[in-house]
Structures are given as structure tokens and as C-alpha cells.
Amino acid sequence: MYVPLLRPFFFMCCSFRYAQILIGFCWFLTAMAIYLSIWVAPSDFQQGENYRIIYVHVPAAWMSLLIYIAMAISSVLFLLTKHPLFQLFSKTAAKIGALFTLFTLVTGGFWGKPMWGTFWVWDARLTSVLILFFIYLGALRFQEFSADVASIFICIGLINIPIIKFSVNWWNTLHQPSSISQFGTSIHISMLIPIFLIFASFFFLTGIFFILETRQIILSFYFQRKSQ
């Protein structure tokens, strides 16, 4: 017996109200982050003003990994239960995750250009993130043919997540090591707060996209069934 939220009718009744609440949180956090990152956070002594792109680059990178883990969990649950909502969540996650990964690659290129002299290098971290982007696209492609195959493909793709995370430690890369870890941070608090605010904003934005996209898929399926 599934929890009520996994029933499409219950989801359609409650989800729009939740989306409105998330939109409010998203606007508030974004406004706070913009103010703190532009007018409060100081310039970096090495990169000057160019470093400010980290306020969107780093949270987007976190989201690209977090969404993939959530997508993999949803895929495992689909393989175990065959519940259609888990398949919808995985499909929606692949779309949103691909966008965040592409955004990470683009902003990373603009951040790296002043430091490396080029928008792209075949660095271990950059290459593994590019592979993540292609895995997202592959998951979307497989979803069109078989949900089971797509779910298995997504689970196999989990191998790439620790590679992305630890690539700067395992190999000699141009990408700087992580400035934030469980043991502390090398970033000043005035720079750290906007990063977490943007991350929270991206998190709520992802929730909004999940709700709206899943609602659209459910409605499309409903009208398709009704027309038959």
C-alpha cells in the first residue's frame, strides 16, 4: 500500500499549493543571495571580481550531483515497485539535472578562462562532469524506449559521482580542490553564506520544476487515456 502522496490524484490536489510556497521561498532566498554576493562579499585577492561566478557555479554543481543521486534512488524504487510516479520522477530529474550540469559546465568555463587562459581543458573534474551531462542525456533517451533499461542505466551511472567528487584528490588536476568539506572551509563566511543561499534557492527551484513537470505528465497521460 503506497503512501497517499504517491497516488496521482492526491499529488495533483496538493502539489500546486506546495509549488506556490516554494516559489515564495525561492524569490526570498535569491534576493538575499544577490544582495550579499554583490554588495557585501569582498573581492578575491587573486581573482578580483571574476570569482563571483562561484555563487552560481558551485551551487549548480552541487545540484547536478544531488539530483543524480535522487534520480538513482527513484530508479531503484521503480525497479522494486514498478510505481509509475517513480518513473516520472526519474524522467523529470534527468531533464533538470541535465540543465544544472550544462549550467555548471558553462559557468565553469567562464570562471576558468581568466585563470587557465581557455574556456575548456581536458581536466579530470571537467571531463567527469561532461560525462555526467551525457549520462543525463542518455537517461532521457532510454526513457523513451524502456523505463527498466533507463533505471538500470541510471544506477550504473552512479559510478561517476564519486569520480567527480574525488577527482581533484586522485589526480593532478587544474581544478582547485574543494574549498568546503566536512572538516571545515577555506572560504570567508561573507562568501560562504551567499553560496548556501543560492544552493537553497536552486533546491527549491528544483522542487518547483519537479512538481510542475510531474503535473504536466500526469495531465497528459490522463487526457490521452480519456481520448481513447
From Swiss-Prot:
Its main location: mitochondrion. It is found in: Mitochondrion membrane. The chain crosses the membrane at residues 21-41, 60-80, 96-116, 119-139, 144-164, 192-212. GO terms for cellular component: mitochondrial membrane. Keywords: Cytochrome c-type biogenesis, Membrane, Mitochondrion, Transmembrane, Transmembrane helix. GO terms for molecular function: heme binding; heme transmembrane transporter activity. GO terms for biological process: cytochrome complex assembly. It is a multi-pass membrane protein. Belongs to the CcmC/CycZ/HelC family. May be involved in the export of heme to the mitochondrion for the biogenesis of c-type cytochromes. This is Putative cytochrome c biosynthesis ccmC-like mitochondrial protein.
